[in-house]
């Protein structure tokens, strides 16, 4: 997981404005294993970072963090952007829902489908406050060799 997320971060880092910082802790921790489709999973991480960048409106920070417990791998994408009202926390994952003037509202719904149906995981807003930012978490089962 570290490597795939790291590749997405490196790709994305080259495309962000100077007024935006992008931090990633995944290369500094031990390898984390989960059963993923690398191409689909990388697309989801890139989509979350792109949404975070859009929410920043040109300046702020995006923080991508990996962590794990006994059973799960958690990937957090946190921004210091405009935030999401609590009433929309679940709605943002519905097809067609968007707050952008340009967009189809399909990125997060497709992300949810990829995480839930192809990776047996979960994706959710875990914290957000209008004017302060948002954190979205992907949770996957850890992969253990038999």
Regions found by a protein language model. Give the residues of each.
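A conserved beta-strand-to-alpha-helix junction within the catalytic ATP-binding
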Residues: 1-9
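Short alpha-helical Gxxx[C/S/T] motif in the catalytic ATP-binding
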Residues: 107, 111-112
